[in-house]
Amino acid sequence: MQGQTKSVSFDGREIKLTTGRFAPQAGGSVMIECGDTSVLVTATKSSGREGVDFLPLMCDYEERLYAAGRIPGSFMRREGRPPERATLISRLIDRPMRPLFPGWMRDDIQIVATCLSLDERVPADVLAVTGASMATLMAGIPFQGPMAAVRVGLLGDDFVLNPSYREIERGDLDLVVAGTPDGVVMVEAGANQLSEQDVIEAIDFGYEAITELINAQKEVLKESGIKQEMPKAPEIDDTISTYLDKNCTKSISEVLKNFDQTKEERDNKIEEIKISISAKIDGLKDDNAVKKSLSLNNKLLENSYKALTKKLMREQIIKEGKRVDGRELNEVRAIEADAAVLPNRVHGSALFQRGLTQVLSTATLGTPSDAQEMDDLNPNTDKTYIHHYNFPPYSVGETRPMRTPGRREVGHGALAERALIPVLPAKDTFPYVLRVVSEVLSSNGSTSMASVCGSTLALMDAGVPLKAPVGGAAMGLIKEGKEVRILTDIQGIEDFLGDMDFKVAGTEKGITALQMDMKITGLPIETIGEAINQALPARTHILGKMLDAIETPKDNLSPHAPRLLSFRIDPELIGTVIGPGGRTIKGITERTNTKIDIEDGGIVTIASHDGAAAEEAQRIIEGLTRKVHEGEIFPGSITRIIPIGAFVEILPGKEGMIHISQLSEARVEKVEDVVKVGDQVTVRVREIDNRGRINLTLRGVSQNGGMSNYPEPTPTPVAPLT
């Protein structure tokens, strides 16, 4: 089981591609390794199913926690449903692979990438994408590869190729670019308000590095003896398409050029034309070639009609520069935006509408304990900003069962989340956990970018002090030969019939998120740069409309949002606050009706709907962690009495004891002869013993009326609380 291994020196690291050793019954397999990260990728094809008119491609990324030396935290101690991270990486593999299969393919194809070992210096996702290409080539599946992917980071002014998790966290850019010899096929990025030029240069930097990985795949394929052949597309009976072209072109074109109609009216008219031509074909004689052709393939009419509509729409854009709704190529649809559309039981809300796309976003403020714990291979285990995206069937006028969120919902939520993270306030100034939910109420393209806009408004309505508002738009592309047209703010039909969906989100200062998907085999950097630059004025326009709804974040939180106080204590004193078995902290929470979270670094966060209660809890904790020194004088209250002395609370939650011999200069027979529970006294710290116990005295301390004949001592200064 030696297999064949090809090593590539890549930016000072070695990437190994091993084929022929693992998963021998898979169609094709490769173990791709870099450092201690190992990903096994397999590609398998089975014969197509009858009646399928699309490519049934399945891409699955699987994580095994043993890859990081961990045991799953579930009851069964076994990996269960794929975590969100695995779903996102599955999409990351699918998006650059799908456009590289021939459009006529209908066979079932499954690509499975399994992370078997993880090195925190080498993320597995880009290795899985490159491995998917190699495995597909080894399987002999018709495929317009090779394709490879790299990650680009930005530390200071320098681009970093395939940065580690730590470098990604420290840097201002996390960009993944995938490409073929023909150009870039996929881009995904999160950025800290970077300029358009910086992002374009980063994509170019990454694409240049891809060449080495593409060449390595070619060499492995050559040495394996597997020939990469692209079979000819099956011959398609053009009888129907010719008939439709002759009988429907004029009527469809008239509908597409009627800019005064609504989307519903346009869709209905196009459907009416199809029904009419179908009835006309039914009336033909049985020996007619058109009718014969249709009898052999009942989906031929549907597919040919869609193809004709697509061709006519694209020709209208290329030749006339007009879109189906009459907009110019760089024009944004009409925008409406409103904040505070729900009662303040919801901490923040907003409604954002662009054309027929409408999204309701809500923001909820939570406490640190509401952070999402991620049981996956990502070393960053907690999420304090969570964005969920819901796409119900009624948003497109359809009916279907309501199920758990699919990959699309997870992916769109993650993109909107990524777009807003760079503008969220620092944790030490605004310690809330934030959850935003975007409900798509109506969809006609670019719902993810509408979610970004609506979520910004909802967070501002909730009083979250964002560094800057974030807006976004989806850019489209029509490419016919050398003719290229870039579209701003694409709607549904342009997404469906076009060649690109390029989402760009950011602030006035710069870009915060990108996601580009292609339906063609690659685009040059120049065209991508043109699309990014064309998105800037659109984003500026959108942000202006958003600020008309709410100009700045609200000064006050919803009265139904928790109030948080955050401060720092000495980490060594965390145990003092928690107490034996958690008794101390439990007592504080019960006494003040608050919720208290303490991080390992000593950051204490107190949550309460009553600000005074939160301040009381803070006072108690600061008292517990306040260092007491010998000689200091404190007012206090007698809390309990024992035969040998009395206990005094000198600070919130902190007690010391007055021994019976320290109650008076004279001999005392019973403690109750001098003090009782509830008495207010002034005490001096006599000593702190080696067990940290505080011993107090009344001797020599004035009691505002003279419990002692000694002169009043000079007060000892108390260090300010920090």
Curated annotation (Swiss-Prot):
One of its GO terms (biological process) is mRNA catabolic process. Its EC number is 2.7.7.8. Pfam families: KH_1, PNPase, RNase_PH, RNase_PH_C, S1. It is found in: Cytoplasm. SMART domains: KH (SM00322), S1 (SM00316). It is an enzyme of class 2 (transferase). It catalyses: RNA(n+1) + phosphate = RNA(n) + a ribonucleoside 5'-diphosphate. GO terms for molecular function: 3'-5'-RNA exonuclease activity; magnesium ion binding; polyribonucleotide nucleotidyltransferase activity; RNA binding. Residues 712-722 have a biased composition (Pro residues). Its cofactor is Mg(2+). One of its GO terms (cellular component) is cytosol. Mg(2+) binds at D495, D501. Keywords: Cytoplasm, Magnesium, Metal-binding, Nucleotidyltransferase, RNA-binding, Transferase. InterPro entries: ExoRNase_PH_dom1 (IPR001247), ExoRNase_PH_dom2 (IPR015847), ExoRNase_PH_dom2_sf (IPR036345), KH_dom (IPR004087), KH_dom_type_1 (IPR004088), KH_dom_type_1_sf (IPR036612), NA-bd_OB-fold (IPR012340), PNPase (IPR012162). Its main location: cytoplasm. Residues 631-699 form the S1 motif domain. Residues 562-621 form the KH domain. Residues 700-722 are annotated as: Disordered. HAMAP family: PNPase. Involved in mRNA degradation. Catalyzes the phosphorolysis of single-stranded polyribonucleotides processively in the 3'- to 5'-direction. Belongs to the polyribonucleotide nucleotidyltransferase family. This is Polyribonucleotide nucleotidyltransferase. It comes from Prochlorococcus marinus (strain NATL1A).
